[in-house]
UniProtKB/Swiss-Prot annotation:
EC category: hydrolase
Keywords per UniProt: Cytoplasm, Hydrolase, Metal-binding, Metalloprotease, Nucleus, Protease, Zinc
UniProt-annotated location(s): Cytoplasm; Nucleus
GO BP terms in the entry: cytoplasm to vacuole targeting by the NVT pathway; lipid metabolic process; peptide catabolic process; protein catabolic process; proteolysis
GO CC annotation terms, alphabetical: cytosol; fungal-type vacuole lumen; multivesicular body; nucleus; NVT complex
Cofactor note (record): Binds 1 zinc ion per subunit.
Binding site for Zn(2+): H300, H304, E323
Pfam families cross-referenced by the UniProt entry: Leuk-A4-hydro_C (PF09127), Peptidase_M1 (PF01433), Peptidase_M1_N (PF17900)
Annotated family: Belongs to the peptidase M1 family.
Entry superkingdom: Eukaryota
Record-linked InterPro entries: Aminopeptidase_N-like_N (IPR045357), Aminopeptidase_N-like_N_sf (IPR042097), ARM-type_fold (IPR016024), LTA4H (IPR012777), LTA4H_cat (IPR049980), M1_LTA-4_hydro/amino_C_sf (IPR038502), M1_LTA4H (IPR034015), Peptidase_M1 (IPR001930)
Protein name: Leucine aminopeptidase 2
Length: 618
């Protein structure tokens, strides 16, 4: 009897999840900071989806050390299949006999992570904000959970999870914390931390972090967790908007399903923006800007609590169903809080990111399509703003086509039909057409839509008509500055930007960076002084102003730029700032890198090495 290793919907898993479905995972791990590994076991409850026809279980696994495997408590035969890159070496477990349809078995696997684990990052005390303790966090999206423990590593399977984690330092996981048992004492200086995830989630949302972590309330159902020295400023940054955001999206979709919505602010060397791990969003500290203006990322990660986490793409080929929907809902939250013009402003910024990504890949590249072909490919290689922004523009087009009022009725319907499930683009299309089937006008418009072009054509989609009111004022200001390098009566003053949001100032600075002829050092200094940009606590703003000043050859920004490089490790800021700095003063750039390289995450450090030195041994 043939067992298919490649199930029909997800080409990026080696598991035979068409024969078995994991319904529950118990994860028991010790965090060993000195050895930089997790040691323990996982128990999978697997339900048979055939009537005794499958006599083997195949799980994804990559660079994990497996001790033994038991089926319902009895030792079982197992082997690791030859590696098939980039998917790892599948774990094949033999059964003595098949299992009846819908009956379950428990598969217990003792496991250790190895130094080749791609999901876990281990930070030294030097890479944290108060420099006192080591830190560990996971990032399992897209196919990295299999490097922590063997599993059905596909978004097409969802399981409930119990976490039992021992660590000498506080632990965060993607489940509801058992707060009365948190840190229950255990021997050898370790405590046991327990979390329960009662909503079934895919493997990529399995998340762990451990380090010197404190918590503070930011709403009636929310806490922020971060380093004790940063907890108050993080609380201030997030407490004004978090519950407001939750209330806004609950009106658009339906009530929040996860109990608590919390935010873990990671150490400053975290190289990314954010990750939507359920119950605890993992976020970059660069959103803590002391002006509450960088928290759009929280609206985005919160929106994932519906799109992605509850209703999930069946494979990474349909990633737009996660990210396009989430970007659409994020902007609906922003519209509810800041007004409709702000949604369009955010979409205009997104359109620029989309055009940049299409330019990067090339207009006819496979990865610029809404539905991508990822057979034999690593989903991480396809990652870009395209599923976010092309996906958003498709949904915005559908909203415009049928009318916002009608589309608003479809939103909760869609998220109800697929709640707790995974779907592909074809099911999305069928559900949309079915919902509007009794509305002759909307039905005709949707049936006449060129679905194949939207789904399969590479490159940019048609550009929508956006409300440009919030960018027009910014473009006008940029034009005035451009005229200063010629002859102009324009006299810059603080009132030019007093009514602008931080995001508008970001767009203004991006426009200034596009000037063919850079500002003079004098004008750069004038801008920094008059607008207060040189002292901005908002890293999005400060980073761009320093790039602008360096491009202008303004020596006044060198010191603050190097100081910024010593306190943030997000690659979005670090790489362009080093590139700008080395063009002005390579000696300072190299010295700054040597001074702070141990602070940076290894991925960031390697990238900056390449930027500064080309290829050399790290």
């Amino acid at each position: 009897m043939a067992i298919s290793i490649h199930p029909p919907r997800d080409p990026n898993t080696l598991s035979n999840y068409n024969n078995w479905i994991c319904t529950h995972i118990t994860a028991n791990f010790d965090i060993l900071f000195d050895q930089k590994k997790l040691v323990g076991n996982v128990i999978h409850k697997l339900k048979s989806t055939t009537n005794g026809e499958s006599q083997e279980i195949i799980l994804d696994s990559n660079h994990v050390a497996i001790g033994d495997v038991k089926i319902d408590g009895r030792p079982s035969e197992w082997e690791l299949l030859p590696p098939l890159e980039p998917y790892g070496s599948a774990l094949k477990i033999k059964l003595d006999q098949g299992v009846n349809l819908n009956e379950t078995i428990d598969v217990e696997i003792s496991v250790q992570t190895t130094e080749k684990c791609t999901a876990l990052q281990w930070l030294t005390p030097a890479q944290t904000s108060n420099k006192k303790h080591p830190y560990m966090f996971s990032q399992c999206q897209a196919i990295h959970a299999r490097s922590i423990f063997p599993c059905q590593d596909t978004p097409d399977v969802k399981s409930t999870i119990d976490f039992n984690i021992s660590s000498p330092l506080p632990v965060i996981a993607s489940g509801l914390p058992v707060r009365d048992a948190l840190g229950a004492s255990k021997s050898e200086g370790k405590s046991l931390y327990q979390f329960h995830q009662r909503v079934p989630i895919p493997s990529y949302l399995f998340a762990l972090a451990s380090g010197d972590i404190s918590e503070a309330a930011i709403g009636p159902r929310s806490v922020v967790a971060t380093s004790p020295d940063k907890v108050q400023e993080c609380q201030w940054e997030l407490e004004a908007d978090t519950e407001k955001f939750i209330g806004a999206i609950e009106k658009i979709v339906y009530p929040y399903a996860w109990g608590e919505y919390n935010v873990l602010i990671l150490p400053p060397s975290f190289p990314y923006g954010g990750m939507e791990n359920p119950i605890f969003t993992f976020a970059t500290p660069s959103i803590i800007s002391k002006d509450r203006e960088n928290i759009d990322v929280i609206a985005h990660e919160l929106a994932h609590s519906w799109s992605g986490n509850l209703v999930t793409n069946a494979s990474w080929e349909h990633f737009w169903l996660n990210e396009g929907w989430t970007t659409y809902l994020e902007r609906r939250i922003l519209a509810a809080v800041h007004g409709e013009a702000y949604r369009h402003f955010s979409a205009i910024i997104g359109w620029k990111a989309l055009t940049d990504s299409v330019e990067h890949f090339g207009h006819d590249h496979e990865f610029t399509k809404l539905i991508t072909d990822l057979k034999g490919k690593d989903p991480d290689d396809a990652f870009s703003s395209i599923p976010y922004e092309k996906g958003f523009n498709f949904l915005f087009h559908l909203e415009t086509l049928v009318g916002k009022q009608k589309f608003d009725r479809f939103i909760p319907h869609y998220f109800t039909v697929f709640k707790g499930k995974s779907l592909d683009s074809y099911e999305f299309k069928a559900t949309l057409l079915d919902f509007f089937g009794t509305d002759a006008e909307a039905s005709k418009l949707l049936n006449d839509l060129d679905w194949d072009t939207w789904f399969y054509a590479p490159g940019l989609p048609p550009k929508p008509q956006f409300d440009t009111s919030l960018v027009d004022v910014v473009y006008e200001l940029a034009q005035k500055w451009k005229s200063l390098s010629e002859t102009s009566s324009f006299k810059p003053q603080l009132s030019d930007i007093e009514s602008l949001s931080a995001n508008q100032i970001v767009v203004f600075l991006e426009q200034m960076l596009l000037l063919e002829r850079p500002l003079t050092p004098e004008l750069s200094k004038l801008m920094g002084e008059v607008y207060g940009l040189s002292k901005s606590e908002n890293i999005e703003v400060a980073n761009l102003y320093f790039q602008l000043g360096l491009k202008a050859g303004d020596e006044n920004v060198v010191d603050p730029a190097t100081e910024l490089l010593g306190r943030i490790g997000r690659m979005k800021f670090v790489r362009p700032l080093f590139r700008s700095l080395q063009r002005v003063n390579r000696e300072v750039a190299v010295a700054t890198f040597e001074k702070y390289k141990d602070f940076y995450h290894p991925i960031c450090r390697a990238m900056v090495e390449k930027d500064l030195f080309g290829k050399r041994d790290v």
